[in-house]
Regions:
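Alpha-helical transmembrane segments of multi-pass small-molecule/ion transporters
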Residues: 1-310
Length: 310
C-alpha cells in the first residue's frame, strides 16, 4: 500500500508540474505576464530558492572515493554530449558544429531535476544530485562553451583567470561547494537559519516550473519538429546507454545510482541557448530544442521514478 501511495504521489506531482508549466505559459499568452517576468523568476530561482533548497538538504558525509562518482559523471555526461553534438554535425561548417556542441549538452538539474526529485524523494537523496550537479555546473557555466568556441573558431578567447571568475560568480555552484565542505567537515547550520531557508527552498519546485512555463515557446514548424526530434533522440539514447552503465556496472550504492540516472535524463541546460547566441548563432533552434527536451524529460523522469519505487 505504501508503494502504491508513493507511485500515486509521483503521478500527481508530475501532473502538478505540467499544470504549473501550463499555468506559466497560459499567463504569458493572456499577456498577464511576459518573457521578462520569466527572466525575473529565473533570477529568483538561481539566486534565492535553489541555494536555499541546497542548504536545506545538508547532511553529514564521510569522504570516500564513491562520493566522487556522481561528480565525475556530471562532467563526463557533458563531455559525452559535446562529442555527440560534434560527430553528428561533422559535415557542417565550423560555426554550426560549435553550436551543435553547446546547444544539446548540459543538464538542467538546478531548476528542473532537483525540484522534481525534491518533490518526490526523501531529502537525504538530494545530496547525490548536488554532487552530480557540481560537476555538471562546471561544464555548463563555462566548460561546454570553451569546447564549442574551440570548435567554431579554433581558439579560446578567455583567460584562465576570467574562467575561474565566471565559475565562482555562480551562486548555486558556490552554494554546492559550501554545502559539500560543511558536510565533509560534519558541520551543521543552526536550525533557526534552516527554518528560514526552508521557506524559500520549499518554494523552489513551484517557482522553477512557473518560470519554465513562462519561457517556453511552442511555435515550431513540422520540418523543424522532426529535426529537433532527431537531435533529442541522439541525446536521450546516448544518456540511456550511459544510465545503463551507471545502474548496472558502477560500484556505488543504489540510491546514488538512481539519482544519477534521473539527472542524466534532465532537460538541456538553460544556458544552451545563451551560449549559442554568444557563439554568433541567429537560429532559434537552441531555444526550441531546450523547450522540447523539457517535455521529454518530465515523461522520462516520471516513468523512472515509478520504476524506482515499484
Amino acid at each position: 500500500m505504501d508503494k502504491k501511495r508513493r507511485m500515486l504521489s509521483i503521478l500527481t506531482r508530475s501532473l502538478g508540474f505540467l499544470l504549473v508549466i501550463y499555468l506559466g505559459y497560459f499567463l504569458k499568452m493572456r499577456k498577464i505576464t511576459s518573457q521578462e517576468f520569466g527572466k525575473v523568476l529565473s533570477t529568483i530561482v538561481m539566486n534565492i530558492t535553489l541555494p536555499c533548497a541546497i542548504l536545506s538538504s545538508l547532511t553529514p558525509l564521510y569522504f570516500s572515493v564513491t562520493l566522487l562518482i556522481p561528480f565525475i559523471l556530471g562532467i563526463f555526461g557533458n563531455m559525452l554530449l559535446d562529442f555527440v553534438g560534434y560527430k553528428t554535425h561533422k559535415h557542417s561548417d565550423k560555426l554550426e558544429r560549435g553550436v551543435a556542441v553547446v546547444d544539446n549538452s548540459g543538464f538542467n538539474v538546478g531548476t528542473f531535476a532537483l525540484p522534481f526529485i525534491q518533490a518526490v524523494f526523501p531529502a537525504s537523496y538530494i545530496f547525490n544530485v548536488i554532487l552530480f550537479d557540481t560537476g555538471n555546473s562546471i561544464m555548463c557555466i563555462r566548460g561546454n562553451y570553451l569546447i564549442a568556441e574551440k570548435v567554431a573558431y579554433g581558439q579560446e578567447k578567455q583567460s584562465f583567470a576570467s574562467i575561474i571568475k565566471k565559475l565562482f560568480s555562480s551562486i548555486p555552484l558556490c552554494t554546492y561547494l559550501f554545502s559539500l565542505t560543511f558536510s565533509l567537515l560534519h558541520l551543521s547550520i543552526p536550525q533557526e537559519i534552516l527554518n528560514i531557508t526552508s521557506i524559500a527552498g520549499n518554494a523552489n519546485p513551484f517557482i522553477a516550473m512557473l518560470m519554465i512555463g513562462t519561457l517556453v515557446d511552442f511555435h515550431v514548424s513540422k520540418d523543424e519538429f522532426f529535426s529537433l526530434f532527431k537531435r533529442l533522440s541522439y541525446r536521450f539514447l546516448t544518456m540511456g546507454a550511459l544510465a545503463a552503465v551507471v545502474y548496472f556496472l558502477v560500484p556505488t550504492d543504489l540510491v546514488a545510482k538512481q539519482m544519477v540516472v534521473l539527472c542524466l535524463f534532465a532537460p538541456i541546460t538553460t544556458l544552451g541557448p545563451v551560449h549559442s547566441l554568444q557563439l554568433g548563432s541567429k537560429s532559434p533552434e537552441a531555444a526550441n530544442l531546450n523547450t522540447l527536451s523539457i517535455f521529454a524529460s518530465i515523461t522520462l523522469l516520471t516513468i523512472l521514478s515509478l520504476l524506482f519505487v515499484a
